[in-house]
């Protein structure tokens, strides 16, 4: 294979790595936990990663003592669990 072909292959592999979503083996284990509103009653909007649907979803968060699969923004959820 020519050096140009190798360079093209390397570029395509790099692009593939960047565009490929986080696989379940690279995702933190806490992303598999269910939505947890916690014991408090503030009821604010939060996000959690749903491993069955492979996306971040809204849920009502009580405001305290939730599990680590609880995010203030959908962007934070995606960056951590679904990116």
UniProtKB/Swiss-Prot annotation:
Belongs to the venom Kunitz-type family. Serine protease inhibitor. It is found in: Secreted. InterPro entries: Kunitz_BPTI, Kunitz_BPTI_sf, Prtase_inh_Kunz-CS, TFPI/VKTCI-like. Disulfide bonds join 31-81, 40-64, 56-77. The lineage of its organism: Eukaryota, Metazoa, Chordata, Craniata, Vertebrata. Keywords: Disulfide bond, Protease inhibitor, Secreted, Serine protease inhibitor, Signal. This is Kunitz-type serine protease inhibitor stephenin-1. It comes from the Eukaryota. The record marks 41-42 as: Reactive bond for chymotrypsin.
